[in-house]
């Protein structure tokens, strides 16, 4: 029997035993060694040959990933590990570390219950370490720590044995500080990392060895051995006497929760329905006999089988032919064609897959990433996936030849389905297709894939920055009249309270919640009680509140009112960019009694023009995306590095020195960061390590805002003159 076939048999035997399953993600800052670690774990479990591990990049199955040497998508694989004489099924997802692919990390964290956080012993915690850790804790995913590249401390920094231990302890302290700062309750509930308890391991993924305190006690390998063997370059001895996969997977099995333990805690974080319903009880208990409840965390395209939806199954059992509904899509049943699990790029079919596993299924035509899939016709959907960064750059793409246009439209639809951090839209005026993404690299990869995988030749524009609009003052009531003059809507506008905006972004307030729960959360955040109980809709970080009382026909017209409001948010009056942080109160309405005179063609334009006019009256302002920058350089290069930030309308707000290196933390607008990579390299003679991460939107400075608005309007083919409120209300 082949090694692979044997592995598949062992995997399928363990699927029905949730207490023997561990769903884990491997997360880290870029280049801290996640994929090398994943490969060596697979080799240890007998999935790929040991010689190739670490160089095979089994998890990086995409050509682009292998060529660039970075992970772009999250990859799944199932394997078996023996611990204490028992076999355990480990479903592992390797995630990208580059800031532009943070969306993949968010999605992976929904599917898993535990995370191995990988940190480079020399570089320590970096911005992306912080981001991935925050995402894990937010999803209720328990972390353990692997400090990688320990050999570099000895061979490159030439530290002695005592200094090595001090440095490793510092990394643990830093990660614990992050956990405590992000969620003190979890930290106090035993999520604090502790080398003595075995929730931390040290080693080298590349050279295939690791140690942990419990392993040292049982095997007799000591820190002294580690130091001496690293010093002598004898990695073979270390990998033979303390193999990476044994130490790490032992830690995973012993300290990370199984689906039964995890779901009891996590369901309350990721699902806000009624816990006394059949689906609520089944998910908390991880019950294979309950209704099917699955959350789609990834969609990929298989040339033979079509769309493959991967996701975490929280209750029920999936079989071929199972009829499922996708909440929020058309009310038609999708029949599962194939049910399976992933082994790297390969999909292995299975007869049945019970709750607690990560499933790969075909046949869910209506699903997108983030969909709730269930055998019930109706259920409260899972909380939507909250991404920590937002699209900050856009490129326009067009097909080189007209005959490829239908194919391009289809490919863009597919990309929007596969990667929810990408926004695809069509510029109605020019007919261009616009793709918005997380950064230059993200857009480069997407446009490259359109050409390579999908075979469509395209032309792309240089990247453009994504702006937003918001208001700085309050105004109202503003009157919006329908074209036939028979319907009138009166609205008041004011900026959203920043505390409530944060709660919306963190997923603590949403329209999926029970109304009472939402009202109480808003009142606790300082909102007026009457407003809090009349929230009709939340769109991005905008809120619509109905403060009217007993107006005839309004109930049946409300959906059209909200459509008009949403249309106005899609393009503000200043630069036709998305509007954010806007609170609108509907305070009075006069409607024609005849339904034919208050249809969509009357109501939608009336509300839309009132909102746009109100936004102008309340001080419409332009916001630009900002990135946090962290640069680590030798001390003598500090001046060159800080001037790179300050010369780009940036600010430096922290400088930390450790030994002879300096870490500079600052922020700068995305618009000024084009070409930053090349400039920082040449300014510091290639000795800088840097990383960026999304840090929200800020007002464009008054001195340049008019020029920026003019440029955007010109690019979009809009009139140069900014409209006045009367243009909308006339």
UniProtKB/Swiss-Prot annotation:
Q: What GO cellular component is one of the record's annotations? A: ribonucleoprotein complex
Gene3D superfamilies in UniProt: 3.30.230.10, 3.30.70.240, Elongation Factor G (Translational Gtpase), domain 3, P-loop containing nucleotide triphosphate hydrolases, Translation factors
Could you tell me the superkingdom of the organism this chain comes from?
Archaea
MF terms (GO), sorted A to Z: GTP binding; GTPase activity; translation elongation factor activity
User: Could you tell me the keywords of this UniProt record?
Assistant: Cytoplasm, Elongation factor, GTP-binding, Nucleotide-binding, Protein biosynthesis
- The primary location reported for this protein is cytoplasm
The record's annotation in SUPFAM superfamilies points to: EF-G C-terminal domain-like, P-loop containing nucleoside triphosphate hydrolases, Ribosomal protein S5 domain 2-like, Translation proteins
Protein biosynthesis as a keyword of this entry, yes or no, is yes
* Entry-linked PROSITE patterns: G_TR_1 (PS00301), G_TR_2 (PS51722)
| Matches recorded under Pfam families | EFG_C, EFG_III, EFG_IV, GTP_EFTU, GTP_EFTU_D2
Q: What does this protein do?
A: Catalyzes the GTP-dependent ribosomal translocation step during translation elongation. During this step, the ribosome changes from the pre-translocational (PRE) to the post-translocational (POST) state as the newly formed A-site-bound peptidyl-tRNA and P-site-bound deacylated tRNA move to the P and E sites, respectively. Catalyzes the coordinated movement of the two tRNA molecules, the mRNA and conformational changes in the ribosome.
Q: What is this protein called?
A: Elongation factor 2
Q: Which organism is it from?
A: Methanoculleus marisnigri (strain ATCC 35101 / DSM 1498 / JR1)
Q: Which gene encodes it?
A: fusA
